[in-house]
Amino acid sequence: AEFLQQNPERQVIVEGYTDSTGSANYNQRLSERRADSVRMALLSRGISPERVATRGYGKEYPVASNGTSSGRAMNRRVEVTISNDAKPVAPRSSVSG
């Protein structure tokens, strides 16, 4: 939050993820709640709501195998991306590659 306070032109996207345990609907809502929790923490530290976008992806985009407990733990995460300028950060689903 301190970096964002010192760089008021920067935009942020907070993206939440889950492991593969549970239903798709449950995981989607959980990933959204994770992202929203980080957003609320940033807002409570004085970051303007217009600067912080959120997105939940459920079990999509795992970074590790969901076949192990350590892999599932790694997949339960939130990623915060800060823009290099005043333009909004594109959500993961719109980035090609």
Residue spans for each PLM region:
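Short, solvent-exposed mixed-charge patches
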Residues: 95-97
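Periplasmic OmpA-like peptidoglycan-binding domain that tethers envelope proteins to the cell wall
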Residues: 7-10, 15-92
